[in-house]
């Protein structure tokens, strides 16, 4: 034995602590935006096409965290990679991979209980499934997606964000969850009906954003760089701006439809379930989550 307590011939490998690995990313900040995309229903995303179920095949699996429960409940995770990847990584994505805007899915209907550590299935749309390039691309995609999962720790740190933004909001326009990665804050909004997407998206601007109209959800992803330092006051300003955009979308929907819009009756109870999972690791039963309070 050596004086340092390490057996002779063995060296200690430098490892990061779990705390530093799970904190939101403060290093590798991305530069300011060069080109900004806008959520639109007239044109496809310039880099990430819509998901085609005929060509999709699973390439990897990544375990989630309790802080990503907001995405688990909607069973889809939309990742606009052009917002969070570097220029070199985007070159790899364009030339070597065939990834859609919503590359991660999950099935929670078999267990009907959410504990926060479910596995996400990542898929691609290449023409040669099972090839070496497909397998290697799946590993690269999994490493990027793990950073996205770690970035969902934003919901653990600012657990009040959803409660403030969704206060008295109708179910037609709701905030789902957030991701903070490389100085970029991704804000996920869900528009309930397809007709509302056709009314809201052309009538207003969400800024640097992306739109995904999938099988299960209609998701608008907003990108915010104002709260890059993760200070409390800047995040609260971000929440106020997000709520202002949501209220504008609600007004557009109210003008286009004749039905009255009421505040979501289940949202407050759902927030209690999510808070109990994040703070006390209490699992969420889907029957209780979807039930309407009397």
Curated annotation (Swiss-Prot):
The answer to whether keyword Metal-binding applies is: yes
- Single GO molecular-function term? metal ion binding
Give the motif span (Nuclear localization signal).
239-255
Under the heading InterPro entries, the entry gives: Adenovirus_E4_30/34
> According to the entry, what is the taxonomic lineage of the organism?
Viruses, Varidnaviria, Bamfordvirae, Preplasmiviricota, Tectiliviricetes
Query: Per the record, what is one GO cellular component?
Result: host cell nucleus
**Family per record:** Belongs to the adenoviridae E4 30 to 34 kDa protein family.
What is the protein name given in its UniProt record? Early 4 ORF6 protein
Q: Does the keyword Zinc apply?
A: yes
Which Pfam families is this protein grouped with? Adeno_E4_34 (PF04528)
Role? Plays a major role to prevent cellular inhibition of viral genome replication by nuclear bodies. Assembles an SCF-like E3 ubiquitin ligase complex based on the cellular proteins ELOB, ELOC, CUL5 and RBX1, in cooperation with viral E1B-55K. This viral RING-type ligase ubiquitinates cellular substrates prior to proteasomal degradation: p53/TP53, LIG4, MRE11-RAD50-NBS1 (MRN) complex, ITGA3, DAXX and BLM.
Q: Tell me where it resides.
A: Host nucleus; Host cytoplasm
What keywords appear on the UniProt entry? Early protein, Host cytoplasm, Host nucleus, Host-virus interaction, Inhibition of host innate immune response by virus, Metal-binding, Modulation of host ubiquitin pathway by viral E3 ligase, Modulation of host ubiquitin pathway by virus, Ubl conjugation pathway, Viral immunoevasion, Zinc
Gene Ontology biological process terms, A to Z: symbiont-mediated perturbation of host ubiquitin-like protein modification; symbiont-mediated suppression of host innate immune response
Per UniProt, subunit arrangement is: Interacts with E1B-55k.
């Amino acid at each position: 034995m050596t004086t340092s307590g390490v057996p002779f011939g063995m060296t200690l490998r430098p490892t990061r602590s779990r705390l530093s690995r799970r904190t939101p990313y403060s290093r590798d900040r991305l530069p300011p935006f060069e080109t900004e995309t806008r959520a639109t229903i007239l044109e496809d995303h310039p880099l990430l096409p819509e998901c085609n179920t005929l060509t999709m095949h699973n390439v990897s699996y990544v375990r989630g965290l309790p802080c990503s429960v907001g995405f688990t409940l909607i069973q889809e995770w939309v990742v606009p990679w052009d917002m969070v990847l570097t220029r070199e990584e985007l070159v790899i994505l364009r030339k070597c991979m065939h990834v859609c805007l919503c590359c991660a899915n999950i099935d929670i209907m078999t267990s009907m209980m959410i504990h926060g550590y479910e596995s996400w299935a990542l898929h691609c749309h290449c023409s040669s499934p099972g090839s070496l390039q497909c397998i290697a691309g799946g590993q690269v995609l999994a490493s990027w997606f793990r950073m996205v999962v770690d970035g969902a720790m934003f919901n653990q740190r600012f657990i009040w964000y959803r409660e403030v933004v969704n206060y008295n909001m109708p179910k037609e326009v709701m905030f789902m969850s957030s991701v903070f990665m490389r100085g970029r804050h991704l804000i996920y909004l869900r528009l309930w009906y397809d007709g509302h997407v056709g009314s809201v998206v052309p009538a207003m601007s969400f800024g640097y954003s992306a739109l995904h109209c999938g099988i299960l959800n209609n998701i608008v992803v907003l990108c915010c760089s104002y709260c890059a330092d993760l200070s409390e006051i800047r995040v609260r300003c971000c929440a106020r701006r997000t709520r202002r955009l949501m209220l504008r979308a609600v007004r557009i929907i109210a003008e286009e439809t004749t039905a009255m819009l009421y505040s979501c009756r289940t949202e407050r109870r759902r927030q209690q379930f999510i808070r109990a999972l994040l703070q006390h690791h209490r699992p969420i039963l889907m029957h209780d989550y979807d039930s309407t309070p009397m």
